[in-house]
């Protein structure tokens, strides 16, 4: 537990070095909100094979906030995928989700993963 806490703290500290502390924290909270919005949209849409798009979109939106958003998106994505893999989700699907996460965080268009026919609302 101490190791995990130390890693999170160091990640936070490294992210803060790029800008002001309050700016970073604000970006992180806004990025977490972007991730939550993508998750709720994914659940609302219930679209078959749409999860990669929502992963990429949530990470993309969060990353647009700045370094704090990138940090939040990475931590949330990693935690979610680790949790799902631990509880029996396939390794290949987890890796595909992580690729979509990285795609979005890098600033690439999340529509690359958009499934055909998904309503324009999303």
Swiss-Prot record:
Keywords tagged on the record: Acute phase, Amyloid, HDL, Secreted, Signal
Signal peptide region: 1-19
Reported effect, residue 120 to D: In strain: SJL/J
Region (Disordered): 89-122
GO BP annotations listed: acute-phase response; response to stilbenoid
InterPro entries in UniProt: Serum_amyloid_A, Synovial_Prolif_Regulator
GO (cellular component) term, any one: high-density lipoprotein particle
Tissue expression as described in the entry: Expressed by the liver; secreted in plasma.
Location(s), subcellular: Secreted
Keyword flag Secreted: yes
Biased composition (Basic and acidic residues): 89-108
Main location: secreted
Highest taxon of source: Eukaryota
UniProt-listed PROSITE patterns: SAA
The keyword Acyltransferase is assigned to this record: no
Coiled-coil annotated spans: none
Family: Belongs to the SAA family.
Assembly description: Apolipoprotein of the HDL complex.
Record's function text: Major acute phase reactant.
Protein name: Serum amyloid A-2 protein
Gene name linked to the record: Saa2
């Amino acid at each position: 537990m101490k190791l995990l806490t130390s890693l999170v703290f160091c990640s936070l500290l490294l992210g803060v070095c790029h800008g002001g502390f309050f700016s970073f924290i604000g970006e992180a909270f806004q990025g977490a909100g972007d991730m939550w919005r993508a998750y709720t949209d994914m659940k609302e849409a219930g679209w078959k094979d749409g999860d990669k798009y929502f992963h990429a979109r949530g990470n993309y939106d969060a990353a647009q906030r700045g370094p704090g958003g990138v940090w939040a998106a990475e931590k949330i994505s990693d935690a979610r995928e680790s949790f799902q893999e631990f509880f029996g989700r396939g390794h290949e699907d987890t890796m595909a989700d992580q690729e979509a996460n990285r795609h979005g965080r890098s600033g690439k268009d999340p529509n690359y993963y958009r499934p055909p026919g998904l309503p324009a609302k999303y």
